[in-house]
């Protein structure tokens, strides 16, 4: 069966969103403290954690054709779209789109990149969903956890830009960077600019992925996202048709409801 952007899928992580993932870059300027891709690259000796913010294109950036794929293609999944890789990103994305594929664009968006993409992808609007990630409305919290990424207001502005240009839009609040009440505020802050869905998920494996020097901040996240907080969040939004739950939330709900 052909999968739509928000079809129910079996699996966790990116498998909840797409059948296929693509990337053309190793490293990410956002340099998020909790990044799974940075942790994995360091673990498998592909790129030192301290070098993760230095972006480098991979051989996938040089492809000249792309096949028609069943389901949704998520591109990128382990890096972001930045001025460094924007030209290559647009070129590869167009290869994906011209074969009729549906493209899920996940990003902590920069205005300069979004403005270029909405022009470059004109005519493919029906095949694209922009899903922009933001975990808080608080600038200081965003700057701490995501030091190289755009601040929340710029990301919300990008939602407005994409929606106004006729594209479908979605938000990923994964990871949540605060607790129930601030996440509720964030949902309402972005809701006017969302055409499709808002996904919510916890910060995963923070003790494993975040440097030990930030242990106090990790412990605060764990407190703000304890089972009681998550259940309060779930009860608040459980009947909201726009809200979708990531696997980290579903696990808590299943366990607490047993």
What is the meaning of each model-derived region?
Residues 230-258:
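C-terminal accessory regions of radical SAM enzymes
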Residues 34, 210-213, 256-258:
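Short aromatic-enriched loop/helix-cap "lid" or pocket-rim segments at secondary-structure transitions
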Residues 40, 44-47, 87, 183, ...:
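Short linear functional motifs in flexible/disordered or boundary regions
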Residues 58-233:
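Conserved AdoMet/S-adenosylmethionine-binding subsite of the radical SAM
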Residues 1-72:
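N-terminal [4Fe-4S]-dependent radical SAM core
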């Amino acid at each position: 069966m052909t999968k739509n952007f928000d079809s129910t899928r079996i699996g966790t992580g990116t498998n909840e969103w797409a059948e296929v993932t693509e990337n053309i870059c190793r490293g990410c300027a956002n340099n998020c403290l909790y990044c799974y891709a940075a942790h994995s690259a360091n673990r498998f000796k592909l790129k030192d954690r301290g070098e993760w913010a230095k972006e480098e294109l991979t051989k996938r950036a040089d492809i000249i054709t792309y096949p028609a794929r069943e389901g949704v293609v998520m591109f990128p999944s382990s890096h972001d779209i930045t001025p460094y890789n924007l030209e290559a990103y647009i070129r590869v994305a167009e290869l994906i789109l011209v074969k009729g594929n549906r493209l899920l664009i996940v990003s902590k968006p920069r205005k300069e990149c979004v403005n270029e993409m909405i022009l470059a992808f004109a005519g493919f609007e029906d095949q694209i969903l922009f899903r922009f990630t933001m975990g808080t409305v608080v600038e200081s919290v965003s700057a701490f956890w995501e030091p190289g990424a755009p601040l929340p207001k710029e990301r919300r502005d990008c939602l407005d830009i994409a929606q106004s240009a006729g594209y479908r839009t979605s938000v990923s609040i994964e990871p949540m960077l605060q607790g129930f009440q601030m996440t509720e505020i964030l949902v309402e802050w972005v809701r006017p600019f969302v055409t499709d869905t808002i996904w919510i998920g916890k910060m995963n494996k923070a003790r494993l992925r975040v440097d030990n020097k930030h242990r106090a901040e990790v412990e605060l996240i764990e407190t703000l996202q304890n089972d009681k907080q998550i259940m309060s969040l779930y009860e608040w939004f459980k009947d909201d048709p726009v809200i979708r739950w990531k696997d980290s939330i579903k696990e808590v709900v299943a366990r607490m409801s047993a």
